[in-house]
Amino acid sequence: MTPHVMKRDGCKVPFKSERIKEAILRAAKAAGVDDADYCATVAEVVSSQMNARSQVDINEIQTAVENQLMSGPYKQLARAYIEYRHDRDIQREKRGRLNQEIRGLVEQTNSALLNENANKDSKVIPTQRDLLAGIVAKHYARQHLLPRDVVQAHERGDIHYHDLDYSPFFPMFNCMLIDLKGMLTQGFKMGNAEIEPPKSISTATAVTAQIIAQVASHIYGGTTINRIDEVLAPFVTESYNKHRKTADEWQIPDAEGYARSRTEKECYDAFQSLEYEVNTLHTANGQTPFVTFGFGLGTSWESRLIQASILRNRIAGLGKNRKTAVFPKLVFAIRDGLNHKFGDPNYDIKQLALECASKRMYPDILNYDQVVKVTGSFKTPMGCRSFLGVWENENGEQIHDGRNNLGVISLNLPRIALEAKGDETAFWKLLDERLALARKALMTRIARLEGVKARVAPILYMEGACGVRLKADDDVSEIFKNGRASISLGYIGIHETINALFGGEHLYDSEQLRAKGIAIVERLRQAVDQWKDETGYGFSLYSTPSENLCDRFCRLDTAEFGVVPGVTDKGYYTNSFHLDVEKKVNPYDKIDFEAPYPPLANGGFICYGEYPNIQHNLKALEDVWDYSYQHVPYYGTNTPIDECYECGFTGEFECTSKGFTCPKCGNHDAARVSVTRRVCGYLGSPDARPFNAGKQEEVKRRVKHLGNGQIG
């Protein structure tokens, strides 16, 4: 039986003794040894050793040759062979992917790596250190940790193993809802400091900033504080009581008015400091913390004050140029009877949120009733769009804070459609095969966290961020079981998938094609529900944001299938279930088109609309928000808020394949402009940190969602 040789790239090839003989002869020539018979004898001896086995690797063969030569009469030949092997190893290493990727980072020539994440400034040293660590982590995971078929599927573009630069090399998870309430009320240890419960709102927000930085350095996805207005309200009360005590001690007239005024100022300043802190922090991951604040449901004076402070600070902007803050992402909850309609007690806060959205794009909105209907309970998304399902503790209480998502594997749906060549039956068969592979990949994420001790991330597991206080040697995997954590199957390109399968008519214009798109997502949902039942883990379906993936999948498919009209010809794939960005429809019809998908993909979703400048037409924006309240759980507003510091222009810069330019004066100096775009579920500043080529092309093609030039 001929043994197989395991090559360095993982491929298996038949063993050939001729290859050994050729290598020895080359070394003999270099050493000045003219003895072909001896070389052939060495090759035969080594071959006989290898033939006794079913599988060998390259290193074993080379070591056997070296040993044989060292025991022979030609020591210079042995030395020449060893040197030859060493030189080949060096040349191979230089040509290898790891070396090439490191060189691309050092020389700043690998644009795909440098622009992969719009939140990472690849020009600065901390980010470059993170990117370097990511290159090594990816390489090690591909070579030593992940199953070969999973790696090959990722490399081909059948699936995408998200955040391979962090996991599974490190036992990290994706995104989470921090249990801020538990940490602030019970106290915790961070570094060398014992943190006691704060005694004022200013201290509470300062501690919150440190918690965000620590947590964001221990996970690779988004960090969310759920219902922050209600969580921090007691610390506003603490501040009020301090100011009231001061007024009484100094016998200040109108002590009540004084205390409220001082508290309002302190609260505003506290959230201003928090916003600046978040936008100036750099985590160990080489980026600004990707943090989300959920708020809007609090009814107390203190909660309302926090809501107003968050919004007014965002409206004010950052620095002397009043630049739009990218983080925190703001998510404002709307609930009928609270702040939805005129006459509701918090309706004035909604008006402030509308003003803020028109000027700063955030907040996005969570429609309370729809969120409960789709996900089973109300909560803020983790990161930009990942939603937890319902989970109850041993006391039957619904728990959200302290829970997390373990990671995502996304399917390349357009590729399956291209492989099916218009055959719908073949598509469904291939889809089932890819689903089995995706499940295998997702299970590696779970397996990586088994046996991990709490001491690897004290802030998460020992100090309360995950809602638990484990001991250093406790196994963390228990808190991820029985649906407490989610783990998600993602997908991309429903629009291109339908085009590849059926061609012709636009998906939006055909009820039959719409049904086909929904059927695909229904099949994905059936799969994750089945996996959840079979494993007990919280598998969910997630509508992948696709910042980098929209470019990567399309690029790989173009190389494999060529430029296919309606599929690969644009240079990007459409995010998840979203309407084609070039399709001009009014915002209400876009909401109607996308509304069937969140109930199916309830592990992650967002809907949004593109608008002109609506700062002077807030009633029109409110009309769309109100329409969304009845139809979708989570809605975002994209409006032109670019600014030119040369000529004073505010509005929308011209987007080209190369960047952004002021339409009034032609300025495109990144230091003299502010350009803000929604990357996927969050905002980015592409003037300072460019998008990848696919995302830039997608942004360039976006049209405004207007009906006959009007909203409302």
Swiss-Prot record:
The keyword Metal-binding applies. The modification Glycine radical is found at G681. GO terms for cellular component: anaerobic ribonucleoside-triphosphate reductase complex. InterPro entries: ATP-cone_dom, Form_AcTrfase_GR_CS, Gly_radical, NrdD. Transmembrane segments: none annotated. Keywords: ATP-binding, Metal-binding, Nucleotide-binding, Organic radical, Oxidoreductase, Zinc. GO terms for biological process: 2'-deoxyribonucleotide biosynthetic process; DNA replication. Activated under anaerobic conditions by NrdG, a tightly associated activase. Activation involves the formation of a glycyl radical at Gly-681. Its EC number is 1.1.98.6. PROSITE patterns: ATP_CONE, GLY_RADICAL_1, GLY_RADICAL_2. Zn(2+) binds at C644, C647, C662, C665. It catalyses: a ribonucleoside 5'-triphosphate + formate + H(+) = a 2'-deoxyribonucleoside 5'-triphosphate + CO2 + H2O. It holds the Pfam family ATP-cone. Gene3D superfamilies: 3.20.70.20. Residues 3-92 form the ATP-cone domain. Catalyzes the conversion of ribonucleotides into deoxyribonucleotides, which are required for DNA synthesis and repair. Forms a tetramer composed of two NrdD and two NrdG subunits. This is Anaerobic ribonucleoside-triphosphate reductase. It comes from Salmonella typhimurium (strain LT2 / SGSC1412 / ATCC 700720).
